[in-house]
Amino acid sequence: MHDKKFLVGLIGADIQMSKSPTLHETEARHQGLDYRYELLDFAERGLPASALPDLLDEEERRGFSGSNITHPCKQTVIAHLNRLSEDAEMLGAVNTVVFRDGERIGHNTDWYGFYENFQRGLPDVAKSHAILLGAGGAGVALAHAAIKLGIERLSIFDQDSKRAETLAGQLNDRFSRDCARATTDVGSTLRSADGLIHATPTGMKSHPGLPIDPEWLLPRHWVADIVYMPLVTELLSLAERKGCRTLRGGGMTVYQAAAAFELFTGIAPDAERMSRHFMDLCRLSA
């Protein structure tokens, strides 16, 4: 048993169903750590997302080692940090904050989580062209991972077209080639695409529904979702009925959590053990 006690958290909205506390705490027990993971939920506390600085102050005051950050704060949190890791600065989004030596340090483990999940779940799919839905805090990480995975051309759609255009420009500059563009027509873009990457809250229990017209999806498409509550979203259910290859969001959750766990503790977790435990949790809550 290690002497140090770890108190970590998750800040976000509508997060009461999150599996992160059990996922982290179970791995910590295997590692012999005294480790507690708390949820700081805007909705549960009746607070607006603008209360983010107060929740960060609370965590720091109570001696938290760090905190995960989720929707809707992955970009707004940056203004309240002292510095960013290279990945977080490059992506302009943070999903993990470490409190160390009086500083708040922002990291991004989302892109790594998606990258690892895709490599394992869809290793041999066509990657000439894919469409990304969502250019927010999660979308910027997934876009980066998509190009690193070898997707040659990425079309990006967001309800805020300027945000999609900005992300496409950032990717083209970062990778020094014309690898991304914004689109305002998902249906026609999907006709020429190999796959769809979904990075919006649509499909969560608090945001039910489909992000696309069902007719746009064809059996030849692959579909990757980041939503993991429920594990099989309406989008993935539709894709499976149509015969598409699919990638569930749970794997991304596990691999980003494993990376965050190491940032909080300095101890490398067993990611495969965490994955098995995550699937057990999903079966219990199904």
Predicted regions and their residues:
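Phosphate/diphosphate ligand-binding glycine-rich loop within oxidoreductases
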Residues: 2-123
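Hydrophobic Val/Ile/Leu positions in short beta-strands of Rossmann-like dinucleotide-binding domains
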Residues: 10, 132-133, 156, 225
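Glycine-rich Rossmann-fold phosphate-binding loop(s) that bind the pyrophosphate
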Residues: 13, 135-136
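N-terminal Rossmann-fold NAD(P) dinucleotide-binding loop
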Residues: 139-140, 232
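Conserved S-adenosyl-L-methionine
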Residues: 148-153, 242-245
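NAD(P)-binding Rossmann-fold cofactor-contacting core
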Residues: 151-174
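Rossmann-like adenosine-cofactor binding region
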Residues: 176-248
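Adenosine-phosphate binding glycine-rich loop
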Residues: 226-286
